Amino acid sequence: PEIRGKRYDDAKHKRAMVLMSNSDILFFHLLFAGFATLFGACVGSFLNVCIYRIPRDESVIAPRSHCPHCNTLIPWYLNIPVLSWLCLRGRCAACKGPIAFRYTLVELLTGMLFLAVFMKWAAPAALHMPPIAQPLMIPVYWLFLAGLVLGTFVDFEHFIIPDSVTIGGMAVGPLLSALVPALHGQDLWWQGLRSSGIGLLAGFGLLYAVGWIGTRAFKKESMGFGDVKLMGAIGAFLGWKAVLFTIFASSLLGSVAGLLLI
């Protein structure tokens, strides 16, 4: 009986240790998920600076954040992502001028995108990847999505896509693909670089061809060159399959939007 009792206690102790271990894993997973969201919101705050200043050829580093109406410098405690806009009810604390909801939208969107990337690549399903690849995938996708957010909102307001997003993406994509070949489902650096190069050429070439055909058919420019460079950057980061999916999805969404506007 004593032996059976000891075995029972050992089994009970092991179950308790497993439950504690799972609780610790869940705690740290939620902790880092919260950090990813907050970090994304902070990156979104910086992207707002870039969205406002890059089209105006202003430095994104200096001067500090200021009100676009009265140029009053914004102190750090009034520059907290999302919360400051809500507390100030979308108005400058100094001149009461309106602050566009776009600032909060960019911060929220970037925070949610960063969280989604973390939840994707920190999940148990991603553990089959090489140990060094898994943590590196997260910042690479964060950088890629930050560039897309920047390019999207600048294009929405000014109908241009900054070269820092397009040309920068085409330059950085192959380098990061060589560093993290798992980005393209590869194991060796040269395989990742090759896949990135194929994706870049596919994205740039396909959209350039579509634009060239459209210009000849309609006798006017049918597509901006910024879109061509952006597709090249997408291919450099995600490969040729992502290029085909992006072209198909954007065409489908464009068709749906056109039908709704008729």
Feature locations, PLM:
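Acidic/polar hotspots within intrinsically disordered regions
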Residues: 8-10
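Short, strongly hydrophobic alpha-helical membrane anchors
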Residues: 12-29
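Membrane-embedded alpha-helical segments in integral membrane proteins
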Residues: 18-21, 109-126, 175-180
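Functional transmembrane core segments of multi-pass inner-membrane proteins
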Residues: 36, 128-133, 137-258
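N-terminal signal-anchor/start-transfer transmembrane helix
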Residues: 38-48
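Membrane-proximal soluble regions of multi-pass membrane proteins
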Residues: 47-102
